[in-house]
Amino acid sequence: MDKCKKYFDFGGEVFITDPQINSRQAYSKFILQELHKHIHTNFVLIVQWDGYIINPDAWSDQFLKYDYIGAVWPWHPMGRMVGNGGFSLRSKVLCQLTASPNFVYSDDNEDDQICHLNRVYLENQGIKFAPVEIARYFSFERELSNIKTFGFHGDFNFERLGLY
């Protein structure tokens, strides 16, 4: 969090310590069902321990035109490639919808549940997912590129970025 705050001025920050999240399933459940209660702005930047802002000058207000933006998953079919949640920007509206009774829960990671399992439901509610062309400037995870992105996700990228 300190690495992100060093480069960017947020409208507020919340560091949540309770309840203890000790599994992938518990993390997904918290993000999908509880996170919206802690958001006091129109958007939330999700930053897991293995990702953060690397190019603050790469920020674009274009990112705020979408309810969900995260790194491209190149192994998914076109139209479903935007999805990594480890460093992602989400609207409060999206976070409220993931806690609704109509959202279908599974044991998949929360980002898969949002971007694949419930995508049609969310889009029918007016949720907009960023297109690949925009997401590539927001963050990267597995996709190698020369684009200077706003942030990244994945400890496997630390060496590549010279962060060791």
Give names to the regions the model predicted.
Residues 19-21, 50-53, 74-76, 93-95, ...:
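Short, solvent-exposed loop/turn segments at secondary-structure junctions
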Residues 3, 30-34, 58, 68, ...:
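Alpha-helical elements of Rossmann-like donor-binding domains used by nucleotide-donor carbohydrate transfer enzymes
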Residues 51-82:
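Conserved donor-nucleotide/metal-binding helix-loop-beta segment in metal-dependent transferases, i.e.
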Residues 41-54:
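Short beta-strand-to-loop acidic/aromatic patch adjacent to the donor-nucleotide binding site
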Residues 1-42:
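Active-site-proximal specificity loops/subdomain of glycosyltransferases
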Residues 38-40, 60-64, 90:
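Short, conserved loop/helix-junction motifs that constitute active-site signature segments
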Residues 80-164:
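Catalytic core and acceptor-binding pocket of nucleotide-sugar-dependent glycosyltransferases
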Residues 18-27, 76-77, 135-139:
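A short acidic, often aromatic-flanked loop/helix-cap motif at beta-alpha or helix-coil junctions
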